[in-house]
């Protein structure tokens, strides 16, 4: 897709979004739900970024990392993610043995500069919505709840992913990329708060952050929001959509517990399997807000 067509699609999406925001009256005490992208709304298992991290290390430095190592810092901005992978004891030891020095910023820049073009090409292959995600989002919109979003992807990747997701029916009211703001991304609250500003939200306590990574949940806490962690559709379980649908109860229980042990470290208000389970949480938070409770 060339840049002119891409820009036209993004402009059309933004025009539609602004009209929707202005014409919708909220029937809920919840003002906005802010979603992560990969592993939350699209890309079941969050495979697009992780597989490209593995490929980027291999291509740039002939250095092997495992998919599991690539998953550990998920949720951070991608430059920070590469840095965090390099600091993993297992990776740092192998890097020192192979190159005789620790990974430095120049190395991270090289890997990042390899990662971005690869990710732009392949992100559209992972733009399929997670089961029932579009229905859940559209039902929230019908209630007058605004849909925000933010991602660990930089804007260059989001400019490819946004129109691909739109073709599949996902049209958030706001999209913030990890390099849109000068102060950096997660776990700081800047991207979530940028959504608050752009959406015209009156109180962060009336917002919910939904994410499949601990930095994303910490982002929500730091922004003063309710937080909902996803266990089975995201990075920590690492299942494909097909594996999830075909898995036995035992397999799902094992994957759920594995993810729960990681995600509970960020103290989410709620832990659910996938976005399909979100409506019940929405109702509970609505009742808590009506009673005067806050995150």
From Swiss-Prot:
<keyword id="KW-0378">Hydrolase</keyword>
<keyword id="KW-0479">Metal-binding</keyword>
<dbReference type="GO" id="GO:0008967">
    <property type="term" value="F:phosphoglycolate phosphatase activity"/>
</dbReference>
<feature type="active site" description="Schiff-base intermediate with substrate">
    <location>
        <position position="78"/>
    </location>
</feature>
<protein>
    <recommendedName>
        <fullName>Phosphonoacetaldehyde hydrolase</fullName>
        <ecNumber>3.11.1.1</ecNumber>
    </recommendedName>
</protein>
<dbReference type="GO" id="GO:0050194">
    <property type="term" value="F:phosphonoacetaldehyde hydrolase activity"/>
</dbReference>
<dbReference type="GO" id="GO:0006281">
    <property type="term" value="P:DNA repair"/>
</dbReference>
<dbReference type="GO" id="GO:0000287">
    <property type="term" value="F:magnesium ion binding"/>
</dbReference>
<dbReference type="InterPro" id="IPR006323">
    <property type="entry name" value="Phosphonoacetald_hydro"/>
</dbReference>
<comment type="subunit">
    <text>Homodimer.</text>
</comment>
<feature type="binding site">
    <location>
        <position position="38"/>
    </location>
    <ligand>
        <name>Mg(2+)</name>
    </ligand>
</feature>
<comment type="function">
    <text>Involved in phosphonate degradation.</text>
</comment>
<dbReference type="InterPro" id="IPR050155">
    <property type="entry name" value="HAD-like_hydrolase_sf"/>
</dbReference>
<dbReference type="InterPro" id="IPR006439">
    <property type="entry name" value="HAD-SF_hydro_IA"/>
</dbReference>
<keyword id="KW-0460">Magnesium</keyword>
<dbReference type="Pfam" id="PF00702">
    <property type="entry name" value="Hydrolase"/>
</dbReference>
<dbReference type="GO" id="GO:0019700">
    <property type="term" value="P:organic phosphonate catabolic process"/>
</dbReference>
<keyword id="KW-0704">Schiff base</keyword>
<comment type="similarity">
    <text>Belongs to the HAD-like hydrolase superfamily. PhnX family.</text>
</comment>
<feature type="binding site">
    <location>
        <position position="36"/>
    </location>
    <ligand>
        <name>Mg(2+)</name>
    </ligand>
</feature>
<feature type="active site" description="Nucleophile">
    <location>
        <position position="36"/>
    </location>
</feature>
<dbReference type="InterPro" id="IPR036412">
    <property type="entry name" value="HAD-like_sf"/>
</dbReference>
<dbReference type="InterPro" id="IPR023214">
    <property type="entry name" value="HAD_sf"/>
</dbReference>
<dbReference type="InterPro" id="IPR023198">
    <property type="entry name" value="PGP-like_dom2"/>
</dbReference>
<feature type="binding site">
    <location>
        <position position="212"/>
    </location>
    <ligand>
        <name>Mg(2+)</name>
    </ligand>
</feature>
<dbReference type="GO" id="GO:0005829">
    <property type="term" value="C:cytosol"/>
</dbReference>
């Amino acid at each position: 897709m060339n840049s002119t067509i891409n820009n036209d699609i993004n402009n059309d999406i933004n025009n539609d979004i602004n009209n929707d925001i202005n014409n919708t009256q909220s029937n809920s005490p919840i003002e906005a739900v802010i979603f992560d992208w990969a592993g939350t709304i699209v890309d079941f298992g969050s495979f697009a970024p992780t597989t490209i991290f593995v490929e980027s290390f291999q291509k740039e430095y002939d250095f092997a990392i495992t998919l599991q190592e690539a998953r550990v810092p998920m949720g951070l901005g991608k430059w920070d993610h590469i840095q965090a992978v390099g600091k993993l004891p297992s990776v740092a030891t192998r890097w020192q043995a192979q190159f005789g020095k620790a990974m430095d910023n120049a190395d991270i820049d090289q890997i990042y500069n390899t990662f971005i073009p690869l990710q732009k090409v392949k992100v559209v292959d992972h733009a399929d919505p997670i089961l029932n995600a579009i229905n859940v989002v559209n039902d929230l919109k019908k209630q007058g709840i605004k849909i925000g979003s933010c991602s660990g992807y930089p804007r260059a990747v989001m400019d490819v992913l946004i129109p691909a997701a739109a073709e599949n029916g996902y049209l958030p009211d706001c999209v913030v990329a990890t390099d849109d703001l000068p102060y950096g991304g997660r776990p700081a609250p800047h991207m979530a708060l940028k959504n608050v500003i752009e959406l015209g939200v009156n109180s962060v306590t009336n917002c919910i952050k939904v994410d499949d990574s601990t930095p994303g949940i910490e982002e929500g806490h730091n922004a003063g929001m309710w937080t909902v962690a996803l266990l089975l559709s995201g990075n920590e379980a690492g299942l494909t959509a097909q594996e999830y649908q075909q898995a036995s109860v035992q397999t799902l229980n094992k994957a759920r517990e594995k993810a729960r042990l990681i995600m509970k470290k960020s103290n989410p208000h709620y832990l659910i399997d996938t976005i399909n389970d979100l409506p019940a949480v929405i109702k509970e938070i609505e009742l808590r807000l009506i009673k005067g409770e806050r995150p």
